[in-house]
Amino acid sequence: MIEFGNFYQLIAKNHLSHWLETLPAQIASWQREQQHGLFKQWSNAVEFLPEMTPWRLDLLHSVTAESETPLSEGQLKRIDTLLRNLMPWRKGPFSLYGVDIDTEWRSDWKWDRVLPHLSDLTGRTILDVGCGSGYHLWRMIGAGAHLAVGIDPTQLFLCQFEAVRKLLGNDQRAHLLPLGIEQLPALKAFDTVFSMGVLYHRRSPLEHLWQLKDQLVNEGELVLETLVIDGDENTVLVPGDRYAQMRNVYFIPSAPALKKWLEKCGFIDVRIADVCVTTTEEQRRTEWMVTESLADFLDPNDRSKTVEGYPAPQRAVLIARKP
């Protein structure tokens, strides 16, 4: 059983304590009514994993845990098998005692693009919205964050996160809650808020920006990473039924348009930090994610377009501040 008591105890003593007015009831409701049909199977995989204490832990350059002496073949096989029960693994990679999880996304590449543009994370309390398996939560801790909280309603991601946590010595500096941003009160408590790969899935993107702003302290920093298209501040793509085979893509603005949206929502010091095309080296099929990936979503005769004829995915990072 995945429990959240440690997180409740942690925030009871800090500036997030007012979250306890709503959070435990939301989690209890989720545990009673909303669990996925495979959740028991996934949580059993976490339960059967050994709790390991790394001899060497690197969260600064990667997410890597090593033991002082190599694990036996049987120990490695047990860990490998249990982690494979949590497939597909989309966000990573992770290297855990000789088991290398080669995820669909090279999320480390994204982190390397984002990190140079951030304010120093040392001592910060961070929220990562739509955090997936929590890979970037661990990298935030590696960069000096005091506490990294992720929210993502996808229950497989919660189990993947808890599996990794167990293999990292039950580290309590990062936590993942099975919630969406719309379930959070206006906490106004986080020094940095990340929203990476979420905005284009929102029916109302400006409402999402307001929700992110409501989580920040005054002078807090927003890190927004999302799909963009080429164009000026008035350019926005509204795809038809699908974009790159995804049904739930609503608005893809240009980077200048997105900057304008952020300013309209009251953010200041907005800057476009990075724009890059997503490659099939960064997002691809692996033995840990065996279904279709980016290469299958692009026009085989023109890789600059999706199979639907839209511009191929490119992603921008924008940094902004709440006044």
From Swiss-Prot:
Signal peptide positions (record): none
Specify whether Transferase is a keyword of the entry.
Answer: yes
So what does this thing catalyse?
carboxy-S-adenosyl-L-methionine + 5-hydroxyuridine(34) in tRNA = 5-carboxymethoxyuridine(34) in tRNA + S-adenosyl-L-homocysteine + H(+)
Q: Which GO biological process annotations does it have?
A: tRNA wobble uridine modification
Stored Gene3D superfamilies? Vaccinia Virus protein VP39
Fetch the Pfam families from UniProt. Methyltransf_9
Query: Binding positions for carboxy-S-adenosyl-L-methionine?
Result: K91, W105, K110, G130, D152, P153, T154, I181, E182, M196, Y200, R315
The protein's UniProt keywords, in alphabetical order, are:
Transferase, tRNA processing
Q: What happens when the gene is disrupted?
A: Deletion results in tRNA having 5-hydroxyuridine (ho5U34) instead of cmo5U34.
Molecular-function annotations in GO = methyltransferase activity; transferase activity, transferring alkyl or aryl (other than methyl) groups
Q: Which domain of life is it from?
A: Bacteria
**EC number(s) of the enzyme?**
2.5.1.-
Please give the subunit comment from the record. Answer: Homotetramer.
Q: Which NCBIfam families match?
A: PRK15068.1, tRNA 5-methoxyuridine(34)/uridine 5-oxyacetic acid(34) synthase CmoB
> What protein family is recorded?
Belongs to the class I-like SAM-binding methyltransferase superfamily. CmoB family.
| The protein's role, per its UniProt record | Catalyzes carboxymethyl transfer from carboxy-S-adenosyl-L-methionine (Cx-SAM) to 5-hydroxyuridine (ho5U) to form 5-carboxymethoxyuridine (cmo5U) at position 34 in tRNAs.
This protein is called: tRNA U34 carboxymethyltransferase
- The protein's organism comes out as Salmonella typhimurium (strain LT2 / SGSC1412 / ATCC 700720)
